[in-house]
């Protein structure tokens, strides 16, 4: 649907008030606009009243029936914000809705993974059907077909909800209750129903605990989870979350956006303002978190004296102050229809409310939130590679819930880090093969958290003079989740909550790194700095680097270029993917497959097997810049001296990887180990030729940290060249991580003066790299390569972009210290010299 059309539907524009251009996009057809109104309203589960669909579709009941059918067919969450309509009007409870969904997918013999994540979690909560239970039910369903008396899927599903968690502050509403229903109720149940009908909605904590559960299981009541403007929400490590698939419907998208943005010091109204999302939608999402048990309220007053005696021994995360009249938390669309508490009006235009919150209650919540002395935090940015390591390694029994939280919520807040650190401490440092990689990342992550979190020495000069310095709290943020927000919203979220961003290194090439001027970012300044372009930039400014060839998408090789003759191993980087080392003997087919859908960087890596790499941490100490070049003092390498003069390494942190292609130290099988980077596949399954070949990863045994093996043999400066430069804190090596953290502290990188210099240097570096990249985009459409028989090429005709980083429009070669355009022959005489860096 057209974005402009959606905007005008969302803001209830009738056809007569639509701008001319919007009408033209609809073919000047009012009927088409009305169709779009109905479709948008159903997809977004909008209430019939007070929305444009009321003027388009006259039958309210039919509209809700269509909405329910669409939601069920698309496996969406039950529309709890429409519970008054769904339960009282259509007699569809959440239990019957999910039982119908489960019946549908069983009859279609779909896998459990077809259920979206949140829908699967709600099914598990109400039906008690998870992955294993579903497989068992499907086996029973299939086996029953072999016998005369066949059982349907419905026969195998539960007849009533499982025991669910109900909080005392939830509101009990009367459902669709007939006289026949009353007859089967016990005396206490009848009393509770009479109280709800006569006195209005009741806090569940004011009723008998067992009666509430009994009435809910019978479908006679439904539960609202009220969220007010001042509600503050905490998200603990996820329990009961089902990792299936992401569907992408409006509410699921909203849930993930709020997940990564929410914190327990920001109330719902402030959060809606930061995200620029309608307040009622944010309340619906937060209410869903609480209902599913993924979040709980903060800052509420517990008054046990007002609770029904049956609730006294019931464990509860939180309880609303029960002296608050639940009727005051409800809103009404008109004089006679009660509105769900989670649908409070979000603007002053909703004048049909029957009450406002008690000012005293609002004040008590506000004072609690203000008295916490909340300060901004440090954010440590990681990617999904880290969460994969924590989940796959089977490192600790309770570590997985934290890893799932880091992946699904996109954030692990400082309040959860104590329990996370306890689980990381349980990880043993012993492992073999690939498992060792998981152990190393877990242990190094723990050290990084301990270093950044509440480190008073780290930020000694950034604290306010009138406040004691305890350092800053730390949140862990997943880059991919932040990128789910639009750039402006992401910037507002980061500015509101954080004083400094620190990235892990290296971030996978498969994501676009977060760019930020404020708060300052110790990490890649712009996406191009974390791309293939930056490698070429480093080689260009230093005049040193391995033989490299960047081929544009669509290029086809007939033979391996001459600059790679004699190399036993090549480092291959497919655009938007992480690099891998492959044998030169059988690389041609894989290269051509990859080039059909991606630009590719080819680099010489090893003459005698895999080349040897050494990681040199920066910023450099004065002692590291003096003396003669040795393996233990690579900081005096000429290339690094030039690099320091062109790139400010004193206010950044990270490491430079040096490569010795002629070393025979690392001549061992590729399969024995793995690289510090994550994804193993270069040629993905989306390859147009259907190739399933993949590039194996750089072996980690070939990588060492500076001074790890200081006496492992003589080495010449000319043997070593820079391979790459990564900004951030590395997690793949504990020794390298320790050195980088130590340098951050000793050089005061997190102090105010250093961060100001960092901001200036980041902008300068960004401009230089962007100019460098831009110089290869001009004239791309007119470039004509005349390949000799050894090479043929089909170039991209425009400098298109992948994930925001421009693709190369020219084939480029780096050889003998010179970056030049490659025409398919021997090195071109046409050098790229007009670079003003």
Swiss-Prot record:
GO terms for biological process: intracellular protein transport; vesicle tethering to Golgi. Pfam families: FAM91_C, FAM91_N. One of its GO terms (cellular component) is trans-Golgi network. Residues 334-366, 670-691 are annotated as: Disordered. It is found in: Golgi apparatus, trans-Golgi network; Cytoplasmic vesicle. Keywords: Cytoplasmic vesicle, Golgi apparatus, Phosphoprotein. Residues 340-366 have a biased composition (Polar residues). The modification Phosphoserine is found at residues 332, 340, 671, 828, 834. The keyword Transcription regulation does not apply. Residues 670-680 have a biased composition (Basic and acidic residues). InterPro entries: FAM91 (IPR039199), FAM91_C_dom (IPR028097), FAM91_N_dom (IPR028091). As component of the WDR11 complex acts together with TBC1D23 to facilitate the golgin-mediated capture of vesicles generated using AP-1. Component of the complex WDR11 composed of C17orf75, FAM91A1 and WDR11; FAM91A1 and WDR11 are required for proper location of the complex. Interacts with golgins GOLGA1 and GOLGA4 and with TBC1D23; interaction with golgins may be mediated by TBC1D23 and interaction with TBC1D23 recruits TBC1D23 to AP-1-derived vesicles. PANTHER family: PROTEIN FAM91A1. Belongs to the FAM91 family. This is Protein FAM91A1. The lineage of its organism: Eukaryota, Metazoa, Chordata, Craniata, Vertebrata. The gene is Fam91a1.
């Amino acid at each position: 649907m057209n974005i402009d059309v959606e905007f005008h539907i969302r803001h209830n524009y009738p056809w007569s008030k639509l701008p001319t251009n919007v009408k033209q996009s609809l073919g000047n057809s009012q009927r088409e606009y009305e169709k779009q109104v109905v479709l948008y309203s159903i997809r977004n589960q909008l209430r019939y009243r007070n929305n444009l669909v009321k003027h388009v579709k006259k039958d309210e009941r039919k509209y809700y029936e269509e909405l329910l059918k669409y939601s069920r067919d698309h496996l969406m969450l039950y529309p709890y914000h429409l519970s008054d309509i769904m339960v009282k009007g259509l007699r569809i409870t959440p239990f019957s809705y999910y039982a119908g969904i489960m019946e549908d997918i069983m009859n279609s013999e779909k896998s459990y993974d077809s259920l979206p994540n949140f829908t699967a979690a709600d099914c598990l909560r109400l039906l008690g059907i998870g992955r294993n239970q579903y497989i068992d039910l499907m086996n029973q369903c299939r086996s029953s077909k072999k016998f005369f008396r066949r059982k349907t899927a419905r026969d195998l599903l539960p007849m009533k909800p499982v025991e669910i968690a109900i909080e005392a502050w939830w509101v009990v509403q009367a459902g669709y209750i007939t006289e026949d229903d009353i007859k089967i109720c016990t005396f206490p149940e009848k009393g509770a129903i009479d109280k709800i009908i006569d006195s209005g909605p009741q806090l569940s904590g004011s009723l008998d605990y067992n009666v509430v559960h009994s009435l809910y299981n019978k479908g006679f009541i439904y539960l609202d989870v009220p969220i007010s403007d001042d509600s503050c929400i905490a998200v603990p490590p996820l329990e009961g979350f089902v990792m299936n698939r992401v569907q992408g419907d409006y509410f699921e998208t909203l849930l993930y956006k709020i997940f990564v943005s929410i914190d327990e010091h920001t109330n719902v109204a402030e959060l809606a303002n930061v995200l620029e999302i309608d307040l009622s939608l944010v309340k619906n999402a937060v209410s869903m978190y609480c209902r599913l048990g993924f979040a709980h309220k903060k800052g509420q007053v517990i008054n046990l004296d007002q609770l029904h005696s049956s609730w006294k021994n019931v464990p509860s995360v939180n309880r609303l102050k029960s002296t608050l009249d639940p009727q005051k938390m409800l809103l009404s669309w008109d004089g006679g229809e009660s509105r769900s508490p989670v649908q409070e009006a979000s603007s002053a235009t909703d004048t049909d409310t029957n009450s406002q919150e008690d000012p005293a209650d609002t004040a008590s919540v506000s004072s609690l939130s203000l008295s916490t002395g909340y300060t901004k935090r440090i954010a440590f940015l990681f990617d999904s590679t880290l969460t994969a390591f924590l989940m796959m390694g089977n490192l600790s029994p309770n570590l997985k819930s934290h890893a799932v939280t880091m992946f699904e919520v996109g954030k692990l807040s400082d309040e959860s880090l104590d329990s996370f650190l306890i689980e990381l401490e349980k990880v043993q440092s012993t492992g073999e093969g690939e498992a060792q990689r998981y152990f190393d990342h877990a242990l190094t992550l723990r050290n990084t958290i301990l270093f950044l979190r509440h480190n008073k020495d780290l930020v000694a000069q950034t604290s306010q003079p009138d406040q004691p310095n305890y350092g800053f709290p730390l949140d862990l943020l997943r880059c991919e989740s932040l990128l789910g927000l639009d750039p402006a919203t992401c910037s507002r979220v980061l500015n509101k909550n954080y004083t400094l961003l620190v990235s892990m290194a290296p971030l996978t090439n498969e994501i676009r790194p977060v760019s930020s001027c404020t708060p300052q970012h110790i990490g890649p300044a712009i996406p191009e700095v974390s791309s293939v372009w930056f490698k070429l930039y480093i080689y260009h400014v230093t005049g040193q680097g391995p033989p490299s060839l960047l081929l544009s998408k669509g290029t086809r090789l007939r033979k391996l270029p001459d600059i790679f003759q004699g190399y036993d191993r090549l480092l291959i980087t497919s655009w938007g993917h992480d690099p891998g080392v492959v044998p030169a003997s059988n690389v041609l087919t894989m290269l051509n497959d990859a080039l059909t859908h991606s630009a590719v960087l080819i680099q010489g890596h090893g003459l005698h097997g895999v080349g040897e790499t050494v990681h040199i941490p920066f910023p450099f100490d004065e002692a590291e810049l003096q003396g003669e070049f040795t393996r233990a003092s690579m900081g005096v390498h000429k290339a690094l001296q030039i690099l320091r003069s062109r790139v400010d390494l004193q206010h950044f942190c990270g490491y430079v990887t040096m490569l010795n292609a002629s070393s025979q130290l690392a001549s061992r099988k590729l399969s024995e180990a793995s690289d510090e980077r994550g994804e193993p596949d270069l040629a993905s399954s989306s390859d147009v030729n259907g190739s399933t070949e993949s590039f194996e990863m750089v072996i980690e045994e070939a990588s060492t940290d500076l001074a790890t093996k200081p006496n492992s043999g003589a080495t010449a400066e000319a043997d070593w060249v820079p391979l790459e430069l990564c900004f951030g804190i590395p997690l793949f090596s504990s020794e390298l991580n320790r050195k980088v953290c130590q340098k951050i502290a000793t050089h005061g990188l997190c102090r105010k003066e250093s961060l100001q210099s960092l901001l200036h240097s980041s902008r300068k570096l960004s401009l230089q790299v962007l100019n460098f990249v831009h110089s290869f985009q001009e004239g791309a459409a007119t470039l004509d390569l005349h390949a000799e028989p050894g090479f043929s090429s089909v170039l991209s005709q425009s400098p298109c972009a992948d994930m925001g980083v421009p693709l190369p429009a020219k084939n480029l070669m780096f050889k003998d210290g010179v970056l030049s355009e490659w025409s398919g022959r021997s090195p071109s005489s046409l050098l790229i010299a007009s670079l003003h860096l």
